[in-house]
């Protein structure tokens, strides 16, 4: 249990000047104090893990600690505004600051970033796939928790938000019992072809949606259409999806820079004509997973004459979008 582990390691994981302060207070006398905790940048309140840990420590030490917040979980707060008040014995609180701050800052900033992702793409559903990029399971749980908080706030603005996480333990934050996911590239390589990997997946999980991972052999269009043709009876039920994860070193099958510009100018001309940074331009028309690539794949699949129904494409942005949230925590 993470709470127990952190409790046992308070002395070894706390900033040393807090430990020295505790010795001084022990020598010269304790006082009742109130800590006002704040962040130096705006964020969304996601402090449940910190509060639960402080309560756990209070129970272990058999002391009384009063905890209050002027905000509710999911509320926005400003830079420098107190988001948490902790009152109690200074001797028993002073050595906790390092560890509870570790549970407050990252969660609040990640929740804000998750919120922004969801409202920027309100019609898209997201899966939190940060686990493989985190520094341990505690951070992974923290990021999933933060994604759930930011997502709930975004849903109040009619965004679809996060629908789950890729691992089972933190799936409780999304009211699920297990993680979500389909297949890694390794399975496509193991199967020897995209279509064979789908056959294996469907034979093992016949009741689940088929999610095509078509970039392994560089045939995003051809392989997607091949799967749709073979599983058209599922495509008409919206049970065939495409996960686009093309690396940034190349364009998807049949696409290039000129075609990318043509697509964006046709379907979203204002995004090209108005001001945008070079980084934003790369996401619009660059190689890999771009806005143009999504449109191109969608248009190509919908032109498949062998499919009797329009293929439903759902891009859950599984291409490490959440990892960028983790990076921005430390900005």
Regions found by a protein language model. Give the residues of each.
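Buried, small/hydrophobic-residue-enriched core segments of structured protein domains
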Residues: 41, 75-77, 84-307, 311-326
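C-terminal structural cap/anchor segments
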Residues: 328-331
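Flexible, solvent-exposed loop/hinge segments and secondary-structure transition points
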Residues: 1-94, 98-107, 111
């Amino acid at each position: 249990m993470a709470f127990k582990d952190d409790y046992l390691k308070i002395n070894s994981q706390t900033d040393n000047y807090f430990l020295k302060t505790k010795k001084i207070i022990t020598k010269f006398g304790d006082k009742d104090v109130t800590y006002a905790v704040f962040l130096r940048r705006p964020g969304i309140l996601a402090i449940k893990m910190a509060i639960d840990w402080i309560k756990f420590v209070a129970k272990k030490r058999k002391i009384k600690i009063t905890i209050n917040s002027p905000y509710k979980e999911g509320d926005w707060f400003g830079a420098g505004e107190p988001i948490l008040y902790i009152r109690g014995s200074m001797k028993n609180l002073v050595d906790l600051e390092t560890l509870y701050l570790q549970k407050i800052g990252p969660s609040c900033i990640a929740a804000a970033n998750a919120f922004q992702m969801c409202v920027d793409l309100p019609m898209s559903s997201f899966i939190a796939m940060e686990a493989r990029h985190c520094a341990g399971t505690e951070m992974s749980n923290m990021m999933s928790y933060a994604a759930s908080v930011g997502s709930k706030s975004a849903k109040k603005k009619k965004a679809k938000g996060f629908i789950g996480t890729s691992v089972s333990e933190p799936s409780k934050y999304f009211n699920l019992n297990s993680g979500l996911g389909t297949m890694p590239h390794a399975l496509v390589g193991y199967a020897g072809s995209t279509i064979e990997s789908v056959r294996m997946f469907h034979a093992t999980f016949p009741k689940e949606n088929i999610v095509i991972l078509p970039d392994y052999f560089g045939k995003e269009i051809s392989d997607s259409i091949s799967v749709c043709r073979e599983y058209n009876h599922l495509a008409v039920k919206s049970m065939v999806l495409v996960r686009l994860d093309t690396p940034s070193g190349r364009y998807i099958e049949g696409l290039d820079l000129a075609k990318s510009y043509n697509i964006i100018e046709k379907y979203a001309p204002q995004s090209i004509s108005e001001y945008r940074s070079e980084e934003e331009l790369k996401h619009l028309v660059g190689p890999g997973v771009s806005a143009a690539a999504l449109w191109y794949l969608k248009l190509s699949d919908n032109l498949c004459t062998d499919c009797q129904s329009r293929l439903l494409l759902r891009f859950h942005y599984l291409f490490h979008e959440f990892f960028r949230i983790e990076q921005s925590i430390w900005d």
